[in-house]
């Protein structure tokens, strides 16, 4: 089955080289409006979006986000932050803490945002970000997610003057495709390894071998990690890498 929306989703690729054409205010507004129409828990909209066009700020982010120069070349960056600050400010200004103390026999207890609150806000944030991605794509504007914004929490908190209960979730680079841009599509896992009916399916060793057959072809014996197979190489490059540890550290700091 095909339609314009499905084609837009399925033809989208991460874009790291951008045309010289600027993103117009009208285009940007359309993207932001689409983001804000994303599904949200209880209509709380537990996120904020910071529009970044200042070149100096983009240069700083290109370094703090794992030294990726293309970030500075994107016409517009959108920083999506999980935001419990606004609601908890609203609670404080309207005596919610005092209300909880008055009604404590009913089980009310006013607390700062918990881990689950950050997860819920992160869900809202990423749904909004993906709406922005699809809206931009429909306008001929490419995008690239930068997960490294989760790193270096203290630096980014200061750079963007983030108050308590606000945490960077994703940085989105936006820019027009260059004429005749060659879209390179990366193969996804077979749906049978991702989509399960009714309950989770634990893969067998044989199924894991089949699932990762194409990925394992990327293994190189001369890899810099001295890994003996693809799984070891990928873990060293991604899951167990220093940037991943820094993400975890930043996350823990934000929760304090």
What positions do the PLM features span?
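Acidic, surface-exposed loops and disordered segments
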Residues: 1-256
């Amino acid at each position: 089955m095909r339609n314009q929306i499905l084609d837009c989703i399925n033809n989208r690729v991460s874009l790291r080289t951008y045309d010289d054409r600027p993103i117009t205010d009208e285009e940007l507004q359309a993207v932001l409006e689409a983001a804000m129409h994303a599904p949200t828990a209880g209509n709380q909209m537990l996120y904020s979006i910071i529009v970044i066009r200042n070149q100096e700020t983009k240069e700083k982010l290109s370094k703090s986000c794992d030294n990726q120069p293309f970030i500075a070349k994107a016409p517009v960056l959108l920083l999506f932050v999980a935001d419990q600050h606004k609601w908890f400010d609203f609670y404080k200004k309207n005596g919610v803490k005092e209300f909880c103390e008055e009604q404590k026999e009913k089980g009310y207890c006013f607390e700062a945002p918990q881990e689950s609150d950050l997860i819920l806000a992160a869900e809202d944030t990423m749904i909004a970000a993906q709406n922005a991605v699809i809206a931009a794509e429909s306008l001929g504007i490419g995008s690239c997610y930068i997960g490294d914004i989760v790193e270096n929490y203290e630096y980014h908190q200061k750079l963007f003057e983030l108050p308590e209960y606000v945490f960077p979730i994703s940085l989105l680079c936006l820019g027009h495709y260059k004429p005749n841009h060659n879209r390179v599509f990366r193969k996804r896992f077979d749906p049978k390894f991702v989509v399960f009916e009714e309950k989770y399916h634990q893969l067998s060793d044989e199924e894991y071998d089949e699932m990762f057959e194409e990925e394992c072809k990327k293994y190189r014996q001369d890899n810099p990690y001295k890994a003996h197979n693809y799984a070891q190489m990928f873990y060293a490059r991604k899951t167990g890498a220093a940037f991943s540890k820094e993400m975890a550290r930043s996350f823990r700091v934000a929760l304090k």
